[in-house]
């Protein structure tokens, strides 16, 4: 069961990424890869969710071959890398047969490349557009115009046109400025205190509290974002006869994201409960404003080469061979600096959150606006390099198995996947000192520099109209730090090694699939044996070793893991009439554990002998014994075609029974031996725990009005789809407590898409609306019940209008996010919702020209 969008449709809306396209497919939506608590802006949606299951457990492929992806912790592909112009079709595969990679709890996204044999003569296009983002250039930098340039050329050649060649490329540049308000994006933001007014104790359970949420950490971010993307692909094809086809595909994909984040943080001393507290108001006894800066460029490069050969030895027997190598690398820099004053009664604030968004009032705005009271808290440099190489081989022998074959047939094959994945970090931290008049031999004994020396214009508003948002001039601060020799005042050597790891993962699979096909009935039943073996090289802390520097306590370690599965599938389709197609399927798929669960280093705390009768020690570790999530999937669908195939009504239902969900839990081990002594050990590690279920219904409608309305109204076509998703899901926190958070993370209950297009002579237009219901975005805490974050309903309108000047030249006007819809997330409490965070998104207007060959 596969839904997809072809290239002819892809170009009719201002979709900039594959994820933008995929979200128009029934049951698919796109989500930001950062989350509300992430350090980056949420201006781009990079990951997709199929039928309500996390992007970590979906597989993205090019022509069926997996492609390398470089992430610190998970397996999700960065879909923003791949421009729509190079793709002939985007497919959401929702039932995974035995001959396919089983990593896809809810499905897979397959990008089908263009073939030179798609048409009988050479074809191509060149498209150039210039755009303006309504938010660009609103902070410091005067950002320029957005640019998109894409081109594709395909031709066949040879004495019998037996050779084909496709070349495509793209260059894109996007600018955006984003204001993000985040009073509740992290677990340590809204605090709850006990119902004892004399106590300053905080609690994690609403039932144990006084029922009043206190906004302790009120952040405002200003992001300046510049993205530059480029790609180049080529495909050489050979089709000497109808029996043989071979291709060699090569692709290079590049993204350079330059992002600056300015921070204004109003924070209180949570150790003292607010005075005069009510449900919506309160006065913090101590508080301050912190000013921060982060420069966080991220450079991503992915290359891929794939070869494929299919050959029919006879009318009944054929082979299908695929070999692929891909490599991905992400280089990330995070240069950070911060200024802050002492926590004080003179710089504190009160709050009023009756509107759902905390509004602050400072007791002394003049003092809070004085940057001279803030000293340098830190200056940091952090570099991360993430790499992955992926080798993929697949080969199959087929007998009477082609689409037009009839009777019994089979497919026998095997596949091999090897991933070599590594992560490396370098991290240093120091301070900048005021050497004017300082005679100390050691510069670190001089006073710290103050913020008034490093303020960058302009200033911006905050939730208090009398208090301004000051920007840090990090360039000047960093230049002084370099001139002073980069004095390092905090030992970050442990942070430079404790997250480093290398994983070498190999997957072997063998599959057998039987087929029975008639003119109306097609049944495919298969079984796959899938075995995974992996070695992990990492570093673990040994507290018995000297800790000067901190990294000296880390020693190399090795882990290994393996697991295997038998994965059955049966997929059937039946043409009940010439206009009605019925489908049903049972499949079993898996979701391999994210790297973050396996690579976690083992760390021991110092033994706690405070109570001699119960000595304790804490241990944090990964779990090489984790098993993948396993899902038994049941699907059924019906499609009715009318208007000579130009119109369609469809309905699909699905049910997924998922086992072995992964949670981070804490368990106690009595009589744990450490250095010859016995302790009660508290072990924090990921484990497989409960199961869950996901179910839903998808509706689709396409209506062509050509035979219903008179000219000129016969040019209308209406497309719409709706998906309803439900689930049974129990969350287990670190303490082992269970609760129902209301659904899976990133699982909207309702998704709607509607598109209305019109063609009349040389004029064409299309308007699209995409709506996503509220969904659980984050579970931020290891314990308690007051930390869940919900993404609010979001609807986006996009449109395009075009006019054919000639048979080859078309001018286009496009608008993305017509109503400037923002992203908003709320924290849910029994007393009502409070803002977790919101992010503005601009309207982008494009004007372009398309040359069709």
Can you describe what each PLM-predicted range is?
Residues 21, 59, 89, 93, ...:
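Predominantly transmembrane beta-strands of Gram-negative outer membrane beta-barrel pores used
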Residues 653-662, 667-779, 819:
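Gram-negative outer-membrane beta-barrel transporters
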């Amino acid at each position: 069961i596969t839904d997809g969008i072809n290239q002819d449709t892809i170009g009719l809306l201002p979709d900039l990424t594959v994820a933008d396209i995929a979200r128009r497919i029934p049951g698919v939506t796109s989500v930001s890869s950062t989350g509300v608590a992430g350090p980056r802006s949420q201006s781009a949606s990079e990951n997709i969710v199929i039928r309500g299951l996390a992007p970590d457990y979906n597989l993205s492929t090019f022509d069926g071959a997996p492609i390398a992806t470089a992430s610190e912790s998970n397996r999700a592909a960065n879909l923003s890398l791949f421009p729509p112009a190079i793709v002939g079709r985007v497919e959401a595969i929702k039932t995974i047969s035995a001959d396919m990679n089983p990593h896809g709890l809810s499905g897979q996204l397959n990008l089908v490349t263009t073939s030179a044999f798609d048409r009988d003569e050479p074809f191509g296009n060149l498209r150039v557009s210039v755009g303006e983002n309504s938010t660009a250039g609103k902070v410091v930098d005067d950002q320029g115009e957005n640019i998109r340039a894409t081109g594709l050329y395909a031709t066949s050649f040879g004495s019998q046109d037996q050779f084909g060649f496709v070349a495509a490329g793209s260059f894109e540049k996007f600018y955006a400025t984003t204001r993000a308000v985040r009073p509740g994006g992290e677990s340590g933001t809204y605090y709850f205190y006990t119902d004892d007014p004399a106590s300053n104790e905080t609690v994690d359970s609403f039932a144990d509290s006084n029922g009043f949420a206190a906004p302790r950490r009120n952040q405002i971010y200003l992001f300046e974002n510049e993205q530059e993307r480029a790609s180049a692909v080529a495909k050489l094809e050979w089709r000497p006869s109808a029996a043989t086809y071979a291709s060699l595909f090569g692709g290079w994909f590049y993204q350079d994201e330059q992002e600056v984040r300015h921070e204004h943080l109003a924070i209180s001393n949570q150790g003292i409960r607010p005075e005069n507290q009510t449900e919506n108001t309160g006065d913090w006894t101590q508080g301050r404003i912190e000013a921060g800066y982060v420069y966080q460029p991220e450079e991503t490069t992915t290359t891929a080469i794939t070869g494929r050969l299919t050959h029919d030895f006879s009318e009944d027997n054929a082979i299908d061979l695929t070999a692929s190598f891909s490599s991905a690398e992400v280089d990330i820099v995070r240069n950070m600096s911060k200024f802050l004053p002492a926590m004080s009664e003179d710089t504190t604030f009160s709050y009023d959150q009756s509107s759902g968004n905390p509004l602050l009032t400072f007791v002394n705005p003049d003092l809070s606006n004085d940057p001279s009271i803030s000293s340098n808290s830190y200056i940091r440099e952090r570099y991360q390099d993430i790499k992955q190489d992926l080798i993929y081989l697949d080969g199959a022998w087929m007998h009477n198995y082609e689409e037009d074959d009839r009777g019994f047939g089979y497919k026998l094959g095997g596949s091999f996947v090897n991933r070599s994945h590594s992560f490396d970090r370098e991290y240093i931290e120091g301070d900048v000192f005021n050497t004017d008049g300082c005679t100390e031999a050691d510069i670190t004994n001089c006073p710290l520099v103050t913020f008034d020396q490093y303020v960058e214009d302009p200033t911006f508003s905050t939730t208090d109209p009398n208090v301004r948002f000051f920007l840090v001039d990090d360039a000047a601060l960093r230049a002084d730090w370099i001139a002073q020799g980069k004095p390092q005042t905090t030992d970050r050597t442990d942070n430079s090694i404790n997250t480093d790891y290398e994983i070498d993962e190999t997957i072997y699979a063998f599959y057998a699939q039987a087929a029975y096909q008639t003119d109306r009935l097609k049944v495919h039943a298969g079984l796959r044996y899938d075995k995974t073996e992996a070695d992990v090289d990492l570093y673990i802390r040994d507290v018995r070793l000297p800790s000067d520097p901190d990294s000296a306590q880390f020693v190399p370690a090795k882990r290994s893991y393996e697991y295997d599965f038998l994965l059955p599938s049966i997929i059937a389709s039946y043409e009940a009439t010439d206009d009605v197609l019925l489908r049903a399927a049972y499949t079993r798929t898996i979701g391999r554990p994210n790297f973050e669960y396996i690579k976690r280093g083992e760390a021991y705390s110092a033994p706690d002998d405070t109570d001699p009768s119960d000595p304790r020690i804490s241990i944090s570790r990964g779990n090489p014994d984790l098993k993948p999530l396993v899902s038994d999937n049941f699907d059924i669908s019906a499609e009715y075609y009318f208007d000579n195939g130009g119109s369609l009504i469809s309905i699909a239902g699905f049910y997924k029974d998922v086992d072995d969900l992964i949670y981070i839990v804490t368990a106690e081990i009595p009589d744990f031996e450490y250095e010859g002594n016995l302790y009660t050990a508290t072990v924090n590690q990921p484990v497989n725990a409960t199961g869950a279920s996901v179910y839903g219904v998808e509706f689709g409608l396409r209506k062509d009005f050509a035979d219903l309305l008179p000219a000129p109204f016969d040019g209308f076509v209406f497309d719409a789809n709706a998906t309803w998703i439900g689930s049974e899901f129990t969350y287990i926190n670190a303490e082992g407590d269970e609760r129902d958070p209301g659904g899976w993370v990133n699982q909207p209950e309702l998704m709607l898409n509607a598109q209305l297009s019109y063609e009349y002579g040389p004029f064409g237009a299309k308007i699209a609306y995409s709506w996503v219901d509220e969904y659980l975005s984050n579970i931020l805490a290891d314990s308690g019940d007051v930390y869940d974050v919900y993404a609010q309903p979001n609807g986006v309108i996009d449109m395009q209008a075009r006019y054919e000047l000639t048979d080859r030249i078309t001018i286009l006007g496009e608008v993305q996010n017509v109503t400037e819809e923002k992203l908003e997330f709320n924290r849910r409490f029994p007393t009502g919702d409070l803002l977790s965070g919101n992010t503005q998104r601009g309207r982008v207007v494009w004007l372009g020209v398309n040359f069709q060959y």
